[in-house]
From Swiss-Prot:
Similarity-based family: Belongs to the acyltransferase 3 family.
One GO BP annotation of this record: enterobacterial common antigen biosynthetic process
Domain of life: Bacteria
Transmembrane segments: 7-29, 44-66, 79-101, 116-138, 145-167, 187-204, 211-233, 243-262, 269-291, 306-328
Function summary: Presumably involved in the export of the biofilm adhesin polysaccharide poly-beta-1,6-N-acetyl-D-glucosamine (PNAG, also referred to as PIA) across the cell membrane.
Any GO MF annotation of the entry: O-acetyltransferase activity
Cellular location(s): Cell membrane
Keyword Cytoplasm found: no
InterPro entries, sorted: Acyl_transf_3_dom
Keyword Metal-binding: no
Keywords, comma-separated and alphabetical: Cell membrane, Membrane, Transmembrane, Transmembrane helix, Transport
Membrane topology annotation: Multi-pass membrane protein
The name this protein goes by in its record: Probable poly-beta-1,6-N-acetyl-D-glucosamine export protein
Length: 350
């Protein structure tokens, strides 16, 4: 029986909440499309503080893989197709249909652009599926490659080089997009370091926990320092906020380590709620952007008090997504929409 690691339950829930907060802050910026000057700059830096959600999910996904497996079979891939790729496609069908009605465009156009090409918020799943295949290949070659510091360093150099030239070299950018058919956010080279970082941490998990027990404060200081490095490298485009950026790689990576370290100190705090958020996190990730606009139409009345706005919006989004998920969970067929994790919840029957 696999050991239940409470810190990872808390970690998954917190990352899920961080992604929602990121999208809520984006909604505020989009509402004020004429924002400029100091207000725009402040919004830019606040949004980037919490932009690490998607990279953290990539790191966590691979950490869990190398932590829980030392060898894999073909079933490793088929399970992820059933419970990750199929839900992505089914939710994408629903999203494409709703968007076709909203924008008065064809369903086929919406489905191809969004789901197949990855030009929607669900692009993250396209990235994750590529890493599942890469992980399977590495397992078949040699599991111990996940412990390679050389591979970790090379992946960092590759990711940073790719993102730097993709951002700053127009010819390189245009060439890549000419030959790569999907959304630019799904290019594996822009996320490859997070994959190997998660793999390395999963392989050395107990050592990582021991390190954090002693040096968590130092990692927090490093997180602050790397964010100031990002500020120093900012190029003046205060509308574009993305984790697909070379200047944020150190910050995103260290923030994952920091949050993991903080989560090791949580044992029972709000555990039932945290457990539900963690179990439904994949479904929340796919569903919440669909309802975000409608919910924002109400909660933006609290915008002048940012903390109240975020708290109420977060409460409603999590409540709605988990509520829908709990109903779907009653029918086993919906595992192809909500994934398999919700069915592992230990909920008392009355």
């Amino acid at each position: 029986m696999k050991k239940i690691r409470l810190e990872l339950v808390y970690l998954r829930a917190i990352i899920c909440a961080i992604i929602i907060v990121t999208h809520l802050l984006t909604q505020i910026t989009l509402k004020h499309e004429n924002m400029e000057g100091g207000s725009l700059v402040l919004q830019f830096y606040i949004r980037n503080i919490v932009i690490f959600g998607t990279p953290c999910f990539i790191i966590l996904s691979q950490l869990l893989t190398t932590l829980n497996y030392q060898k894999v079979t073909y079933r490793y891939l088929t399970t992820r197709v059933k419970y990750i790729l199929i839900p992505y496609i089914l939710m994408g069908l629903f999203y494409s249909y709703s968007e076709s009605l909203l924008t008065d465009t064809s369903f086929q156009k919406q489905f191809i652009e969004n789901v197949l090409l990855g030009q929607w918020y669900g692009y993250f799943i396209v990235v994750i599926m590529q890493f599942f295949i890469l992980s399977y290949i590495i397992f078949k070659i040699n599991y111990n490659l996940f412990n390679s510091k050389i591979l970790l360093l090379l992946s960092f150099i590759l990711q940073q080089s790719f993102l730097y030239y993709f951002t700053n070299n127009t010819a390189f950018h245009d060439t890549v997009l000419h030959y790569y058919p999907l959304s630019e956010n799904t290019i594996i080279f822009g996320w490859i370091f997070y994959f190997f970082l998660g793999a390395y941490m999963g392989y050395n998990y107990e050592r990582v926990l021991n390190f954090l027990e002693r040096y968590l404060v130092i990692m927090i200081v490093l997180a602050v320092a790397t964010y100031f490095v990002f500020i120093a490298l900012a190029n003046g485009d205060y509308w574009n906020v993305t984790s697909f950026s070379y200047s944020l790689t150190p910050y995103n990576s260290i923030m994952f380590i920091v949050i993991l370290g903080i989560c090791t100190h949580f044992k029972t705090m709000l555990f039932n709620t945290i457990q539900m958020i963690s179990a439904f996190s994949f479904f929340i990730y796919l569903l919440h952007p669909i309802i975000l606009d409608s919910l924002f139409a109400y909660t933006n009345i609290f915008e002048d008090n940012t903390m109240v706005f975020l708290a109420i919006s977060l409460l409603f989004i999590l409540g709605l997504c988990i509520g829908v998920g709990m109903i779907l969970r009653e029918f086993y067929i919906f595992r192809f929409i909500i994934g398999k994790q919700p069915y592992k919840l230990n909920i008392n029957a009355y």
